[in-house]
Swiss-Prot record:
Needed cofactors: pyridoxal 5'-phosphate
E.C. designation(s): 5.1.1.1
Any one GO BP annotation for this protein: D-alanine biosynthetic process
MF (Gene Ontology): alanine racemase activity; pyridoxal phosphate binding
Residue positions of the active site: 34 (proton acceptor), 249 (proton acceptor)
Chain positions found as N6-(pyridoxal phosphate)lysine: 34
Binding site for substrate: 133, 297
Organism, scientific name: Rickettsia rickettsii (strain Sheila Smith)
Name of the protein described by the UniProt record: Alanine racemase
Enzyme class: isomerase
Catalytic activity: L-alanine = D-alanine
Annotated function: Catalyzes the interconversion of L-alanine and D-alanine. May also act on other amino acids.
Gene Ontology CC: one annotated term: cytosol
């Protein structure tokens, strides 16, 4: 078992959810738990959020949906964002998973299985309003408006769309997408709607509709919510190096003084990016400690020379992620986003759930 521990505070995630619910007022709030709950544990997080009356959980694939259904039972809604395909349609039906249909081909597939089972099948429709990833195009939406038989056999529960730049509150593209979405919804007056992701929740009530779908904000990746994640690693080796000693592969760091160097048992095999080589930091007792040398597969080195001697010992824990080094702060060092930091948390880490 790994010597490193990821601690996930479920109470913090629940409090983040309640904050979002308070902002959304009368709209329902679901939860994006795709990619194993952004690397933190979809099942554990979903069970915690069910305690706060969350009933809509969004996953990426049928496989993720099946795993969640097996763990949570039948009384919640599990939505599959990537939609339905010929190979997994029967699995979606068997496990009561609701696909988000992204194009006319997926609608056709779901209709086919509706006819096969001789019953209505639930679905969401995804309208592309400008992010241009998934979603029915304007031409496809027009076909649906003009020919309602295209939805025959389907229990259309929600129409959704996704915002491209919701984290920029003043970006006019948000309003463009909102207006496109509203224009489409006029043709489906009795269908519930969902637009707001985490950032969209804070754009105002016009974006909330019937259901919000936060992911990042639940996991502390929004400035108004709290980080629930701590990653700690113990010092497993200490050495005293003289001036001009080289550290790590390819000798990319050379000591500029006599130095005390500590080694921690994590590396790029654990999702700790090589881009942190010679520029990342960890914290020991609230003090910043620089990463020196290359990040290797299983190990990193840190320079603890400036710490008090009483704080330098084998087994001393360094905080890799936590209150001093949040996922967003870490991500900014290497030009990525907090989402990537969390979803890259390695499977070798021991997971500990509190709260």
């Amino acid at each position: 078992m790994s010597l490193c521990t990821v601690e996930i505070n479920l109470s913090t995630i629940k409090n983040n959810y309640l904050l979002l619910q308070d902002v959304c007022k009368t709209s329902l709030v679901g939860a994006a738990v795709k990619a194993n709950g952004y690397g933190l544990g979809a099942i554990q997080i979903s069970k915690a959020l069910i305690e706060e009356n969350c009933r809509h959980f969004f996953v990426a694939s049928s496989e993720e949906g099946v795993n969640l259904r097996n763990a949570l039972g039948l009384d919640i809604n599990i939505l599959v964002l990537n939609g339905v395909f010929e190979h997994d349609a029967l699995e979606l039906i068997e496990y009561n998973l609701t696909p988000v249909l992204n194009n006319l081909k997926q609608i056709e597939i779901w209709q086919k299985f509706s006819n096969l089972k001789n019953r209505l099948l639930p679905c969401y429709l995804h309208f592309n309003t400008g992010i241009n990833r998934l979603g029915l195009s304007s031409d496809e939406i027009e076909q649906l408006i003009n020919d309602r038989d295209l939805l025959k056999g389907l229990d259309l529960q929600y129409i959704i769309s996704h915002l491209a730049i919701s984290e920029e509150i003043d970006n006019p593209y948000n309003l463009e997408q909102l207006n496109r979405f509203k224009a489409y919804l006029q043709y489906f007056p009795n269908v519930k709607a969902s637009l707001a992701n985490s950032g969209g929740i804070f754009l105002g009530q016009d974006y909330h509709f019937d259901l919000a779908r936060p992911g990042a904000a639940l996991y502390g990746l929004n400035p108004l919510t709290k980080n629930p994640v701590t990653l700690k690693a113990p010092i497993i080796h200490l050495q005293n190096l003289t001036l001009d000693s080289h550290i790590g592969y390819n000798m990319t760091f050379t000591t500029k003084r006599d130095s005390v160097i500590a080694t921690l048992p994590l590396g790029y095999a654990d999702g700790f990016s090589r881009n942190f080589s010679n520029q990342g930091e960890v914290f020991i007792n609230s003090r910043s400690v620089p990463i020196v040398g290359r990040v290797s597969m299983d190990l990193i080195n840190i320079d603890v020379t400036d710490l008090p001697p009483s704080e330098i010992f084998l087994g001393q824990e360094a905080e890799i992620i936590g209150n001093y080094c949040t996922p967003n702060k870490i991500a900014s060092i290497i030009g990525t986003i907090g989402y990537e930091v969390l979803t890259n948390l390695g499977s070798r880490y021991k997971r500990k759930y509190i709260g």
